[in-house]
Amino acid sequence: MHITCEGKAYELFEGATPQNLWNMVSGGRDPETAVLADCEGDIIDFQTPFTGDTDVKWIPLGSPLAHRAYQRSLIMLLAIAAKEVYGGKIEVAVKHALGKALYCEFSDGHVPLQKELDVLCYKMEEIVKEGRDITQLTVGISKAEAFLRLKGRKADADLVTQMPVKEISVSQCGTFIDYFFGPMLPDMSFLKIFHLSSYAPGFLLHVPDPCLLYTSPSPRDRTRYRM
């Protein structure tokens, strides 16, 4: 494949990803300067293979596009932490946005106290420090639909069946697999800023402003989010 990036041309193997290209061109730059790839208007994550010849522009962590990937990856982080804390017996459901936060509930309906949320938050921090990779798997639409219906996500399952494709990419981190409707960050190490707070009957997952993702947070911001 013929790939151009930052005014230079590269010949990459079939199946190459933006991560492969970034490894070639980064030159020791901060990883946060490139977390997604803009392939002539098609935004893909670092794990998704190029589909053919293209020109690549890098999207930094502080951009609005990367902020949406940050939010999706943060939801995945929360789900993984809940699976490990509760042994798979209790899942987390993201219900809707509430201001700049996401309102969530536990699958068994219990109302969490802040102390319980702090335990969940610490587990999330552990996963971030480990820097667990986020990878992509290709599955057929029928399998994706069945998976989403099994998880009780009927609206998402209906949406998947309307896609004009035969296969989609699902995200995997360790043994956890789910579909998040968009590009993800390269790995969990980028999710350094987040917070959980009680909000009966559920809780809030606080997502930071985009400007905080590419700057050093102020002391006031540090009190609002975990670092």
Q: PLM features: residue spans?
A:
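Short, contiguous acidic and Ser/Thr-rich linear segments
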Residues: 8-16
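Short amphipathic, charge-patterned alpha-helical segments
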Residues: 16-28
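Loop/turn positions that initiate beta-strands
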Residues: 53-54
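Acidic low-complexity segments
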Residues: 110-181
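Conserved small/polar residues in nucleotide/adenosyl-binding loops
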Residues: 214-221
